Amino acid sequence: MSLSKEVKSFQWTQALRRELQGFTSDVKAAVIKDATSLLNGLDFSEVSNVQRIMRKERRDDKDLQRLRSLNQTVHSLVDPKSTSKKNVLKVGRLSAEELMTLAADLEKLKAKIMRTERPQASGVYMGNLTAQQLDQRSQILQMVGMRRPQQGASGVVRVWDVKDSSLLNNQFGTMPSLTMACMAKQSQTPLNDVVQALTDLGLLYTVKYPNLSDLERLKDKHPVLGVITEQQSSINISGYNFSLGAAVKAGAALLHGGNMLESILIKPSNSEDLLKAVLGAKKKLNMFVSDQVGDRNPYENILYKVCLSGEGWPYIACRTSVVGRAWENTTIDLTNEKLVANSSRPVPGAAGPPQVGLSYSQTMLLKDLMGGIDPNAPTWIDIEGRFNDPVEIAIFQPQNGQFIHFYREPTDQKQFKQDSKYSHGMDLADLFNAQAGLTSSVIGALPQGMVLSCQGSDDIRKLLDSQNRRDIKLIDVEMTKEASREYEDKVWDKYGWLCKMHTGVVRDKKKKEITPHCALMDCIIFESASKARLPDLKTVHNILPHDLIFRGPNVVTL
């Protein structure tokens, strides 16, 4: 859905500046004072060492300890700080609708950031492997004739081999005072010259995003800007880098006026008003959380920074003492609000309280995702398990290649094991982390009066009726068993990678081994049989993200 949307980045920035001008302040004097303190108090030989560490492709616990130690020194030398504070938002200054929008956007932002922090290159997982494993993998790749994957435009993938990844949180943000101090000391330039150069960069930022061409022109007037790197900053490169983004932020902090977001101060007394203003700007310009991995857009950036800490300067302050992430430190409490009026007869497909197992933010995210379903496109549905205890549900639209596919932990484990032997071949242990509440939520969010095709309608009709979806119509194609499964092998050969849950041996009543039944594969098989050809799907994707289908530990992986 969001692929069709355009992030009008600078336009959004300007809108946020207008809406939040009442929360800005003059921070120039404080930033220069801190830069002076850092110039006098920091050991810049250690700064140079940390910069070297940050250029390494693989970094370990010792490297992290060194970074954290230097960050603590910086923290002790500066005044503007962000403090670690849990923020619970309830209905009051913010309406229930605004809170639910906020919760949904935080959930989307979490999904985006987690994907960004698990970088992949050419389909190769670059996760938390040890240095020895990475060396062994490089040797094996060379042995089998594979070259090392080329890195994309986002910069070098940095791998952290650390025991406790939570210690990485909040250790990498840039600070204007630190950027200024490093530029002055490491380029051997007076601090006043650095201030003048960055101020000009900040003035340019009031009308556009400065780029490398702008930087090149400004170097004639301000040679110190030559220390700014032309390479795009990679993920988590630390606050000691000389990126253009760090320099622009510093320039913005030095401007008195301009309503720069970098000078926002958030306090417990104004945090709700500030968030309300952010949501107001979002609504006016249709801002959104993009599903594309990479740098945050202006709305995502301010949302994360404000929700990370409920007190301090979210853009320019030292935040190394802040614990947790934005979605952990800001929570939405709607427990005392009746979001939906009590009704003895629920309206089919109407939005109601989230089902057991789904949070409010997950419910809002699901509602947004389900908006991508075309109510008029041919659609197949199939289930595995019993209508009153389904374990797998798939809804497939062959015209656009999108589908909804999820699982459910069974209530009747004895019946499940029987069905596994003779039908689906699924392992009970693989379903323990399946997200509860999806069945009711997904079926409830299907478009009103939708028409679904199926092969055998009895169980599906009962399932829909049990969810008060009698408005949904079923077309039973009523093929013979043999005809319906004519394309089974071809479908599994081409699309079997879409589902890896059917791992068991399945036998028919004559004890002959057969292919396990998968709800998604069956939808594609029935589509093929009805058209007498295998569908040629240009794209195929599940509209439900993995972390909505399965519960998982709240662990940050970088």
UniProtKB/Swiss-Prot annotation:
Primary location group: virion
Enzyme nomenclature, EC number: 3.1.13.-
Binding site for Mn(2+): 382, 384, 522
Region (Binding site for the cap structure m7GTP): 54-237
UniProt GO BP: negative stranded viral RNA replication; RNA-templated viral transcription; symbiont-mediated suppression of host cytoplasmic pattern recognition receptor signaling pathway via inhibition of IKBKE activity
Positions of Zn(2+) binding: 392, 499, 502, 518
Superkingdom in the source lineage: Viruses
Task performed by this protein: Encapsidates the genome, protecting it from nucleases. The encapsidated genomic RNA is termed the nucleocapsid (NC). Serves as template for viral transcription and replication. The increased presence of protein N in host cell does not seem to trigger the switch from transcription to replication as observed in other negative strain RNA viruses.
Free-text note on domains in this protein's UniProt record: The N-terminal region is important for the cap-binding activity while the C-terminal region contains the 3'-5' exoribonuclease activity. A CCHE zinc binding site is present in the C-terminal region and may thus contribute to the substrate binding and/or the specificity of the exonuclease activity.
Similarity field: Belongs to the arenaviridae nucleocapsid protein family.
Protein name: Nucleoprotein
Provenance organism: Lymphocytic choriomeningitis virus (strain WE)
